Each structure stands twice: as C-alpha cells, then as structure tokens.
C-alpha cells in the first residue's frame, strides 16, 4: 500500500437547481424537530417561567455558534460535510477526528426515540414508553434496510405540515396563557438564578441551530454562496416565533409545578385543545417532528461512515450492502448505538449532555478549520458575501469556540462522573487512533469544497 496520505478535491460541478425557497424549506426541516417538543419541560425545571427567555437566548447563542459555517457558505460551495471542511482546510489528521466522532453521534437520537415513546404512550397507554421507543427505532431500521426511506419523497410536504401545525398551535396557545410568565419579579421566574437560566439555555441550544446543515447542499444550489446563507439565516426569525412562542404556551397555560420537568409539551396542549383536535395536533406536530428527525439518523450516519471506510479510516468490510442497496452493517451499528441509552434508562437531559461533550472536539476542529479560509483561499475570501475582513472572521470563530467550550464544560458537570470520564476517554482514544493512522499512511481523502468559479460564470 502507498504509505502516503493523499487529499483529492473533486472537480467543481455545475450549479444545481435548488433555489432560495427550496433551500429555506430544507433548512426549516433540519432545525424544526424533536428537540422543541422534548426539552422545554426539563429546561423549565432549571429556570421556571423564564424558560421562554432561555429559549430566546439559546437561539441567539446558537446563531453565533454556527455563524462561521454560514460565513463559509457565503464564500465556498460545500457538499461534503464537516469531514470535507477539516480535511480540505486543515489536513488529513483532522479528518480522522470527524470520521470517528460520527461513530458516536447517533446517541442523540436515543432521546428522539424516547420522545416518540412518550408521545405514543399517550395514544397507547397499555404499552410502556421504553417498549414503544425501542419498537419505533427497530421499525425505522427495518424500513431503511428494505430500502424504504418512507420520508425521502415527501419530506417537503411533511415539513410544511409540521410548520403549519406548530404555527397554528402557537398562535392559538398564546391567547390561552394564564400564568405570570412576564412577571420578572415573580417567585417562579428565574427559579434557578443565573446558573439555572444558563443551564436551561445551554440545554435548549442544540435544538436551535440545525439550519446550518443546509450548507452541505452547496453542490445542488443554483446560487450557493448567495442563497445558502440566506436560507440558513431566514430560519432564525421562524425559530424566534415558533420556539419562543411554544415555550410561552407550554409554560404559561398550567401552573409551574404541573409542567416543570415534564418531557413533553402535552399538558398544556391537552388543557387548551378539544379531544379530537388534541390528537390530530399530537400526530401532525410532535410525533411527526420526532419521526422525521429520528428516521434521518440512518442516512445522516450512513454517508460519513461509508466515506470514512472508503478513505481508509475504517475497515472496508462495513460497506457491504444487502440486495436493496442498504449498508446493513452500518445500519445495525447505528441501531445498537441508539438503543443502548434507552436500555440503560438514560434521561433526555443526560443523553443531550453526553452528545454535547462528545461532539465538542469535532465542532472546535471544524470552526478552527473555517478560520483558515483567508490563508488557504485568499482570493476567494476577498469575495465573501458578508464582506468580512480576516479579523472579522477570527472574531466570529473565537465567539463560536467560546460558546462550544461553555457547552462542553456544562455537559461535563451535568452528567454522572462515569459518563463524563467515559465520553472524554472515548474521544481521546479516537483522536489517538486518527493520529496513528495518519502517521501510518495510506489514507486517500476525497473532499467536496469549491471556490465558486462555475457559479460566478452565471452571474
């Protein structure tokens, strides 16, 4: 085997067909998901009626946390995910970190499966939450094994139904608020002080920034460096209305003690909606949000792990596919990772905190790589759509890394010592494996990040 490591950037494709509206719909679908219907109650346990303000803070912090990605999207066409970014801008060894982190990120979907179990339990009270959660994941696993991605062709429709359902619920719910959620001196406001308020915001932040993933559609966008950033940033006002409004409704209809800590938004919904409308809302809103998010885990993990195997980070044997074209070994591994926290009775909060800890190293590595844009592509950087100087980029990247670091520290101190130590040990071990394989050689990486020459031809 050739002992040299090689990075090959694929040729830039011609501009795609996705326009601004298409990209916005994709971005909305990526961010409006199960987090909003599972974390408000637990966050309220930290901060009381000020949970709506904590969600607002989470949205603002989340924006600055992922803004470097959006800046990148306004400078380059990107299609290969974090793996392409770090290998193209920072080198081979960083690619190993991203590739291996993707092996453990499915753990977050355990919380989505638990959420599905909780909501289905309201329709099927005779079956336990754990059984419903496990059954839901296994059914989606089997459907994906059969090559039946049941949401692929209708994702835009489902996202539209979900968006309309949640907007209508928030608009109606805001007229039903009965609790003093705007009384800033009330005894149920800021119940945990500043610490509790920040714990709530940092718990909610992961559900409030997924729109940046539209960046990976740079290959398919017609005007990537213009429309991708626009689509991502246009999600922020939507989140401010839907998420903050939902937190107001969830925390403002019933007394504090009936809602704080509850892992669904159903107590308030059941209080203000008639029976049949309540059930329709539960299916069209929370359950749809959870299923579409949960189903996505298989493809979200499939492509990064498959690429890592092709490039030499993982055994190529895991690429085996069944007769339906599904990589059954990768899917089986993903299923196991998702099921383990459910089997061991971990809570939503614990799962979220573990996820934030294990993704810290990858996130900081990606942001650092983005900060190298002016050095790696000086001419393209001068044309960035935000008209930022290099110093401006460094400032935003520094702010992002600070926020990621705060979340990491919060995560470490918010979970059991054994979980914290295990998470850090796993990530350090994966980093060392990546360094070892880099030194050993034989890694051949294909990246998909381009200076937008083809796009500029059409302007």
Q: Which residue stretches match the model-derived regions?
A:
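Membrane-interface "cap" regions at the ends of multi-pass membrane proteins
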Residues: 1-50, 62-63, 67, 79, ...
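Flexible loop linkers connecting adjacent transmembrane helices
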Residues: 4-8, 14, 47-52, 69-96, ...
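Helix-loop-helix junctions that connect adjacent transmembrane segments
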Residues: 9-10, 15, 52, 128, ...
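Select transmembrane alpha-helical segments in multipass membrane proteins
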Residues: 16-27, 91-104, 135-136, 191-202, ...
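Hydrophobic transmembrane alpha-helices that form the core helical bundles
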Residues: 42, 64-145, 150, 286-307, ...
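TM-loop-TM module centered on a large, flexible mid-protein loop between adjacent transmembrane helices
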Residues: 82-86, 91, 122, 233-295, ...
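Membrane-interface loop-to-helix entry segments
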Residues: 119, 129-179, 191-193, 209, ...
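C-terminal membrane-solvent junction of multi-pass transporters and transport-like membrane proteins
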Residues: 317-326, 363-417, 445-457
């Amino acid at each position: 085997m050739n002992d040299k490591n090689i990075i090959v950037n694929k040729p830039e494709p011609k501009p795609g067909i996705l326009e601004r509206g298409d990209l916005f719909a994709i971005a909305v679908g990526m961010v409006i998901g199960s987090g909003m219907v599972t974390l408000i109650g637990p966050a309220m346990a930290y901060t009381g009626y000020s949970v709506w303000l904590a969600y607002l803070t989470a949205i603002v912090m989340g924006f600055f946390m992922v803004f470097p990605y959006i800046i990148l999207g306004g400078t380059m066409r990107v299609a290969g995910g974090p793996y392409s970014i770090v290998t193209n801008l920072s080198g081979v060894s960083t690619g190993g970190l991203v590739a291996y982190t993707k092996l453990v990120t499915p753990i977050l979907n355990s919380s989505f499966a638990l959420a599905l179990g909780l909501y289905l339990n309201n329709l099927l009270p005779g079956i336990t939450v754990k059984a419903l959660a496990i059954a839901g994941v296994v059914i989606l696993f089997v459907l994906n094994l059969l090559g039946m991605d049941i949401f692929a062709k209708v994702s835009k429709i489902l996202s539209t139904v979900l968006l309309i359902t949640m907007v209508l619920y928030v608009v109606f719910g805001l007229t039903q608020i009965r609790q003093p959620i705007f009384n800033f001196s009330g005894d149920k406001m800021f119940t945990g002080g500043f610490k509790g308020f920040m714990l709530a915001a940092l718990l909610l932040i992961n559900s409030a920034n997924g729109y940046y993933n539209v960046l990976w559609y740079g290959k398919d966008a017609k005007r990537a460096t213009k429309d991708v950033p626009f689509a991502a940033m246009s999600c922020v006002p939507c989140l401010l209305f839907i998420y903050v409004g939902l937190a107001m409704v969830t925390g403002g209809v019933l007394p504090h003690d009936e809602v704080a800590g509850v892992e669904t938004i159903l107590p308030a919904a059941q209080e203000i909606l008639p029976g049949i409308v309540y059930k329709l809302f539960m299916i069209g809103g929370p359950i749809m949000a959870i299923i579409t998010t949960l189903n996505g885990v298989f493809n979200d993990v499939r492509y990064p792990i498959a690429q890592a195997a092709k490039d030499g980070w993982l055994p190529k044997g895991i690429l085996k596919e069944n007769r339906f074209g599904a990589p059954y070994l990768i899917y089986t591994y993903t299923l196991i990772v998702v099921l383990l926290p459910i089997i061991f009775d971990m809570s939503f909060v614990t799962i979220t905190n573990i996820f934030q800890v294990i993704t810290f190293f990858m996130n900081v590595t990606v942001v650092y790589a983005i900060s190298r844009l002016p050095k790696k592509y000086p001419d393209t950087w001068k044309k960035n759509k935000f008209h930022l100087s290099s110093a401006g980029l460094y400032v935003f990247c520094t702010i992002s890394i600070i926020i990621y670091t705060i979340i990491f520290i919060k995560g470490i101190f918010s979970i059991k010592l054994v979980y914290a130590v295990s998470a850090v040990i796993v990530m350090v071990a994966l980093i060392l494996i990546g360094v070892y394989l880099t030194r050993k050689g034989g890694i051949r990486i294909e990246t998909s990040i381009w200076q937008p020459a083809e796009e500029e031809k059409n302007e």
